[in-house]
Amino acid sequence: LLQIHDFPEDGRPDRYRFMARNLAGDGGRLAATLYPLAPHVHYAPLNARDRHFLEQAGALRDRVHRLPNAVASLGASPDAAPQGAERILLYVTRAIRRKNLGEILLWAAMEDAARFQVSRAPRNPAARPVYKRWVAVAESLKLPVEFEVGERDDLPLGELISRAAALITTSVAEGFGLAFLEPWLAGRPLVGRDLPEVTEGLKESGLDLSALYEALRVPVEWFDERMLRTKLTLGYVEMLEAYGREPSSDLP
């Protein structure tokens, strides 16, 4: 039984190149090394998205089994009512780039009657510059956002959750999706961004995520469409190059 978590093909080109070079000699042989196919080999991915990946890559459906993570309590009483007069929306996260802090700032600019809190800063030095940029933007615009509230010794996480009216997520990428489950154990609703490829299995199990949205649509008139297409194309080509792949000839 192989429990696959954090595929190197999924946005980790440095790991992919390292493994291709040291395990298989090249990318062509790496797949056979990492993902063997045989009657006695079964896979246990965390979510429906990864299950689909494995099945589309050739694994037989009856040899792929979704194995969810256990979910631990965040330390808050599910029966506790929100404390204080303010409406607080708490983002329980370590604010690395994929946690998408810019969207929290957008909500803070739009929602006058709420205060937003982000629990922790990133530990990785490489993630600090982007994080600090968003902190600076929030300060310059005087947005109602507090950062690193979970780093304070006088306020444990359970207390922060007890003070919050709801928990929020704006992440653009998750593994198992603990962020979609933990709020309910803490007795708090969850608002923010849905990731259907991650939450599909959770919804099938009966979890109500109807308060989440899948996209924030922006009018085309707000930006230069040609510039956006150029940036998307360049980003796509850079990702291909990072994996040692050639771009297709039909790119705009």
Where does each model-flagged region fall?
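Membrane-proximal helix-turn-helix segments that form the acceptor-binding/catalytic region
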Residues: 8, 18-43
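Carbohydrate-associated surface elements
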Residues: 49, 70
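A short hydrophobic beta-strand element within the catalytic core of glycosyltransferases
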Residues: 167-168
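Conserved donor-binding/catalytic core segment of Leloir-type glycosyltransferases
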Residues: 44, 80-99, 105-108, 117
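Nucleotide-activated donor-binding/catalytic signature segment of Leloir-type glycosyltransferases, i.e.
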Residues: 131-159, 205-224
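Catalytic binding pocket for nucleotide-activated donors in carbohydrate/polymer assembly enzymes
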Residues: 176-180, 184-252
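Aromatic "clamp/platform" in nucleotide-sugar-dependent glycosyltransferases that forms part
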Residues: 172
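A conserved nucleotide-sugar
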Residues: 101, 108-148
